[in-house]
């Protein structure tokens, strides 16, 4: 074993055991010999700002001490704490007293930090309420008002009110928010829709992209790019005109396509991959390659057992978090072994479908504004992406979309992500019909559709069903005329959520839907969360379409 030091300090060295036998892939080595497949990204200018450092950056060995000793059961707790004084003073005090015989780490943290509040956990539901009434009464509980930024806190202040998912998640999340907004619109909460629209536009203006969430430790990555879908929702519900967001959509697109023009064949830079035929497709990425602040110990342990350079594993874990599917067999070389994660080596079908929607939205809004050159440019970009997706990610033999491993030049696993091209109108009718058959036979259950057909212990795999996947499948199949399948998924999901609600009087993050009575979904790095933003949003929208279950 080799002892590898992480941020050693004069006072003490923290050592982590790392296997010397790195996992090597002949396909990857051959590609690396031919060309520098992944040039090192440059740091984004202006980030992080002086008050946007992550807790790991600020507290150095104190942060590692707290996280490595598991002072809090949830690794996210300490990064969400706010300091009671200048972090530098805290660090100096820590270095002075930590070697004292009577030093108590917990007491030190409690004396120098404000612990995060968990407001939604205090809510007690009324068992007499219908499912619809329960959701409508939860919106105020999950709403956070704009407040003055606590100096040096990891929470990024936003100008308007916003919805949080609930439980341990006390900040807003990018792609979660879109599915939450569906329910807000159905509940007549245009006020909150406007606030959230302004918040996301503000983040694009100030950070150049929409971060994973409004925490400093989320700034280095985004999440599935659904702002174009949000804009469409605002337009449909008369909340905000789509035209006002054209510049924001262009800025987000520039973030995802950064570096594309200079890429050679078989080369990747940040989110973009230049394929062997010259076409451009995208992958998930994080600009940092260190353990995530919010899952520090889990990441260190995963990397330790990987047999790979730790920074590679950390990057792939972070990119997996950026995907929203954290974690799934989609990103694993060996199903069931998180240490085999290779997120940055996969071209995801859902990401490229969302970017197709972004390109199409820019073209459509440019047409409304009379910007013909921009319209033509982005229609061509959308057409090119669609052709590349059909070439690399459509499995014609099996009639489904699949992710693509660009390093090995082979298709990856089938998952419910394959329905996103239907949701954004990217597929043709033959593809939609064939995909419907595959979803019916491999993912559909009496409780809804599962994330994948592979049981790995990860939360975005069998046996779990998730609200956003149900919504996109329902609407996607109905868009292509398969009302029967769309309605079946909708009724199955409403039955699942209502059955659990009648027993437990709450909605949760994910559900176990593979056989038997629907129950709490398992897997993942943290306990099951209730609340729950996007489940509430999707179910509230479905109740508006189908009535109470």
UniProtKB/Swiss-Prot annotation:
Enzyme Commission code: 3.2.1.28
Enzyme class: hydrolase
Residues bound to substrate: 168, 175-176, 212, 221-223, 292-294, 324, 525
Keywords of the record: Cytoplasm, Glycosidase, Hydrolase
Any one GO cellular component localisation term in the record: cytoplasm
Entry-linked NCBIfam families: PRK13270.1, PRK13271.1
Xref: PANTHER family: CYTOPLASMIC TREHALASE, TREHALASE
Quaternary structure note: Monomer.
Protein name, per record: Cytoplasmic trehalase
Lineage of the species this protein comes from: Bacteria, Pseudomonadati, Pseudomonadota, Gammaproteobacteria, Enterobacterales
Gene name linked to the record: treF
């Amino acid at each position: 074993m080799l002892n590898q030091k992480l941020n050693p300090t004069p006072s003490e060295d923290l050592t982590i055991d790392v296997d010397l036998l790195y996992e090597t892939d002949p396909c990857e080595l051959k590609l690396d010999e031919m060309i520098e497949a992944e040039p090192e990204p440059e740091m984004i200018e202006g980030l992080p700002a002086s008050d946007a450092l992550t807790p790991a950056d600020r507290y150095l060995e104190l942060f590692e001490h707290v996280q490595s000793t598991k002072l809090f059961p949830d690794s996210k707790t300490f990064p969400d704490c706010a300091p009671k004084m200048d972090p530098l003073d805290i660090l100096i005090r820590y270095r002075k007293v930590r070697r004292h015989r009577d030093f108590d780490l917990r007491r030190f943290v409690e004396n120098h930090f404000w612990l995060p509040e968990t407001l939604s956990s205090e809510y007690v539901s009324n068992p007499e309420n219908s499912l619809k009434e329960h959701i409508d009464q939860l919106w105020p509980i999950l709403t956070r008002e704009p407040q003055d930024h606590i100096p040096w806190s990891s929470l990024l202040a936003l100008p308007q009110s916003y919805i949080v998912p609930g439980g341990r998640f006390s900040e807003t999340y990018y792609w979660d928010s879109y599915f939450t907004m569906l329910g807000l619109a159905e509940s007549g909460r245009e006020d909150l829709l406007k606030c959230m629209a302004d918040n996301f536009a503000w983040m694009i203006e100030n950070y150049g992209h929409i971060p994973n969430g409004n925490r400093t430790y989320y700034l280095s990555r985004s999440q599935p790019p659904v702002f174009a879908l949000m804009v469409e929702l605002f337009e449909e519900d008369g909340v905000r005109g789509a035209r006002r967001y054209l510049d924001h959509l262009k800025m987000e697109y520039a973030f995802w396509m950064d570096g594309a023009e200079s890429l050679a064949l078989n080369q990747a830079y940040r989110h973009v991959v230049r394929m062997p035929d010259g076409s451009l497709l995208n992958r998930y990425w994080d600009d940092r390659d260190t353990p995530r602040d919010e899952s520090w110990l889990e990441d260190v342990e995963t990397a330790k057992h990987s047999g790979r350079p730790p920074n590679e594993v950390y990057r792939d874990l972070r990119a997996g978090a950026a995907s929203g599917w954290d974690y799934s067999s989609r990103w694993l070389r060996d199903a069931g072994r998180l240490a085999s994660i290779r997120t940055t080596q996969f071209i995801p079908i859902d990401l490229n479908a969302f970017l197709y929607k972004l390109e199409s939205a820019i073209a459509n809004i440019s047409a409304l504004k009379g910007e013909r050159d921009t319209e033509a440019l982005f229609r061509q970009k959308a057409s090119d992406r669609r052709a590349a997706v059909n070439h690399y990610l459509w499995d014609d033999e099996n009639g489904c979309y699949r992710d693509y491993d660009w390093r090995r030049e082979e298709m990856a696993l089938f998952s419910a992500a394959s329905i996103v091209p239907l949701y954004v109108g990217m597929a043709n009718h033959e593809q939609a019909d064939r995909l419907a058959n595959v979803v019916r036979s491999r993912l559909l259950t009496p409780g809804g559709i599962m994330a994948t057909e592979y049981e790995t212990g990860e939360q975005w795999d069998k046996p779990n069903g998730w609200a956003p996947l149900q919504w996109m499948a329902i609407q996607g199949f109905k868009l292509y005329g398969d009302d029967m399948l769309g309605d079946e998924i909708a009724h199955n999901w409403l039955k699942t959520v209502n059955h659990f609600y009648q027993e437990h009087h709450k909605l949760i993050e994910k559900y176990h839907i593979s056989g038997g009575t629907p129950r709490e979904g398992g897997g993942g790095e943290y306990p099951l969360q209730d609340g729950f933003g996007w489940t509430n949003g999707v179910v509230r929208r479905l109740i508006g379409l189908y009535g109470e279950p």
